[in-house]
Structures are given as C-alpha cells and as structure tokens.
C-alpha cells in the first residue's frame, strides 16, 4: 500500500504544496490520520505548518488568573471547581492596577499576548464592567488581549469586543459523546453557543480541548472534528494534556502515552492549517524530547513561565534554554515584523530583570506554554 493510499489528506510534497482548508472532515478521515505511521504523520503535519508559518517561531503568551476558585461548574478535571476539595482557596477579582502591573511585567518578559482567566460560570454585570476596563488598560500597553470568563451571551461578547478584547477562550474540552462524563453543569450546546457569540461580536476564537481524561481514541478524533466544523477555524487551538490534581475526580486516571498526545497535535495542525496550535496544560510533565516533537508536529504557541492558572508550568529559564536548543524564537505580535525584533538586546535585559522580580510573586503567571 502506498503512502498516498494510506493518507486521506495526502498531497504532493513539493515546495509549492498548499494544504486545503476544509470544514467537512469525516470522523473516518480524521481517524485515518491518527492511524498513519508516526513518521508519515509528522512529515505531513510539518508540511502543513511550513506552508503557513515560520517553522521556528512560537507565539508566546502570559496567563494571569484574575479570579481564582469557587467556580460553580463541576468539570471533573478542574481544581477551581467548588465541587471538589483541592485545597485551592477562593479569591476575589483582582484589582485593575494589579492586573496592569502584571501585564507590564509580562511585556517586559517578552510576551506578546496577555491572557486573563476568571473562575466563573458567566460574568456578572458588575464584574463585566471591571474586566472591560482591564482589557482597555492592558491593550494600551501594546499587548494582544485574551480572556476566559465562562459563558457569554451576545451582548456580553459585544461589550468585550468594544473594549478591545482580541481573543476569547472557551474550550470544547472533549467529544460530544464523552462530554457528559466530564461535565454536567453546562451542555456542549452551551459551549458552541458561546463560541458563536464570540465570533458574531468580531473577536478571535481560542478553543481546544483536554486529552487524557479517559476518553477513547474516537473521542479525540470527534473533538477535533467539532473544532474543524467551526467556520472559520479557531485562530488559536490549545491542546491540553490532563494535569491530574489531587482532590478532583480525575486524580487517578491512567497516564496518556506522550506519543499519542503528539499524534493529536499533528492531526490538529493538518486539520486547521492556519490556526496557532497551542501546546498547553501538561507541558510541565513532558521532557524536552516530547516538547521538541510537539513543535515538530506543528505546535507553535505556548504559555511562558511558572504557572498556568492553578497548575504547574516550566520555569522561565528552562523554557528559554529549550528555545535555544531547538533554535526557536518568539513570534512577534505581527508575524511579518522585522526579524531583528526577535533578538533585541534590550528585551533580553528586561527579561532577566523581570524574572528576578517575579520569582516570589504569586500573582504572576508567565507564558511559554499553552
């Protein structure tokens, strides 16, 4: 059997190769991609990646939890859920000035995007007024902005967009069939509706899922199929590996094979050629070789730093060392900006100072991960 007959998406590997943008992938086609020989799959994914991106550029973000704990949702993986005893205390919404301070530090550390997350089912009116001001203040620093605040209706989405919010994150988490095993307090349709509201308001969509929650291989394919059906595709697609947190129902789930995770990264890249595929939660548990394979498979976005909301994230120095080993560099806010910005000496000095200032700052969530 030839490689062409094995791969339902196979096209010529010439320098003029251009992947096809599709929204109609069948589940069987996606499963066939997952089943490809590993080297064939990664080769195909790297072809797609190079057709649309600088293959050595990685979009770098910082993530700050602006309101932590006591979420009313019952997501079985989440330490912020009020349904489980994970030792995570409830915190009030951060003051605007504290958020702006952390955004300044993030920019000094080299981040191009500042993401803010709140443990809510949906933002209340008084909270929405505060977070829209946060967006404007952070945006004024020259950073791209992203928020994850739970479900939003059309009016809330429009107000966030008017405030200048660039991206809104709302993950699908898993397949429609497996979803009820993970969450019961909101429906899959609720999630899709929020994404539709975000898109209608004119914001960019950040949406992905979590792997390693006990789902079947077909569920992973079905999750990606749901993301591909979104038109347009999400601009950012975080692929998370479950971080098992003591006290959650998922704390004893069987570990996921890292190579299975890499396959999912590669398939996501093939299916969504122009999206940034984010290597997200779970990166702390990955060795350098696994992370390198993820970048080869098409991951090109990460959170950079010490903490991803309430779960661990590699240290800044380790992230920078890995970038150096692999010859990677941060993607500028404008992907077509002059390459000289990547090696700016002043940014290097600022980064070193920022790391030192932030070592003991519990509020800071740096970003090279995702």
UniProtKB/Swiss-Prot annotation:
Its EC number is 2.8.1.6. Pfam families: BATS, Radical_SAM. Residues 56-283 form the Radical SAM core domain. It catalyses: (4R,5S)-dethiobiotin + (sulfur carrier)-SH + 2 reduced [2Fe-2S]-[ferredoxin] + 2 S-adenosyl-L-methionine = (sulfur carrier)-H + biotin + 2 5'-deoxyadenosine + 2 L-methionine + 2 oxidized [2Fe-2S]-[ferredoxin]. The keyword Iron applies. Keywords: 2Fe-2S, 4Fe-4S, Biotin biosynthesis, Iron, Iron-sulfur, Metal-binding, S-adenosyl-L-methionine, Transferase. GO terms for biological process: biotin biosynthetic process. Catalyzes the conversion of dethiobiotin (DTB) to biotin by the insertion of a sulfur atom into dethiobiotin via a radical-based mechanism. Homodimer. This is Biotin synthase. It comes from Chromohalobacter salexigens (strain ATCC BAA-138 / DSM 3043 / CIP 106854 / NCIMB 13768 / 1H11).
């Amino acid at each position: 059997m030839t490689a062409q007959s094995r791969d339902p998406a196979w096209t010529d590997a010439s320098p003029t190769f251009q992947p096809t943008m599709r929204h109609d992938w069948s589940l069987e086609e996606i499963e066939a991609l997952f089943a490809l020989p590993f080297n064939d799959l990664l080769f195909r994914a790297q072809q797609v990646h190079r057709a649309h991106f600088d293959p050595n550029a990685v979009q770098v973000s910082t993530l700050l939890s602006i309101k932590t704990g006591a979420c009313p949702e019952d997501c079985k993986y989440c330490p912020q859920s009020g349904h489980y005893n994970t030792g995570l205390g409830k915190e009030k919404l951060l003051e605007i000035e504290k958020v702006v301070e952390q955004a300044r530090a993030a920019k000094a550390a080299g981040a191009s995007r500042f993401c803010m997350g709140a443990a809510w089912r949906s933002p209340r009116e008084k909270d929405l007024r505060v977070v829209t001001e946060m967006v404007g203040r952070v945006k004024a620093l020259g950073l791209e902005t992203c928020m994850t605040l739970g479900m939003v209706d059309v009016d809330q989405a429009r107000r966030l967009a008017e405030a200048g919010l660039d991206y809104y994150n709302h993950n699908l988490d898993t397949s429609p069939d497996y979803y009820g095993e993970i969450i019961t307090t909101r429906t899959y349709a609720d999630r899709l509706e929020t994404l539709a509201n975000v898109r209608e308001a004119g914001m960019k969509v950040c949406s992905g899922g979590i792997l390693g929650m006990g789902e079947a291989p077909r569920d992973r394919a079905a999750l990606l199929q749901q993301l591909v059906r979104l038109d347009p595709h999400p601009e950012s697609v975080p692929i998370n590996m479950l971080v098992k947190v003591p006290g959650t129902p998922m704390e004893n789930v069987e570990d996921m094979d890292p190579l299975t995770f890499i396959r999912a990264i590669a398939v996501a890249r093939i299916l969504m050629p122009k999206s940034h595929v984010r290597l997200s939660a779970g990166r702390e548990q990955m060795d350098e070789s696994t992370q390198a394979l993820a970048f080869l498979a098409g991951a090109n976005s990460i959170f950079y730093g010490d903490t991803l909301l309430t779960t661990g994230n590699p240290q800044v120095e380790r992230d920078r060392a890995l970038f150096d080993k692999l010859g990677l560099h941060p993607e500028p806010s404008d992907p077509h900006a002059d390459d000289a910005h990547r090696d700016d000496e002043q940014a290097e000095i600022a980064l070193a100072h920022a790391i030192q200032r932030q070592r003991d700052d519990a509020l800071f969530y740096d970003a090279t991960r995702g």
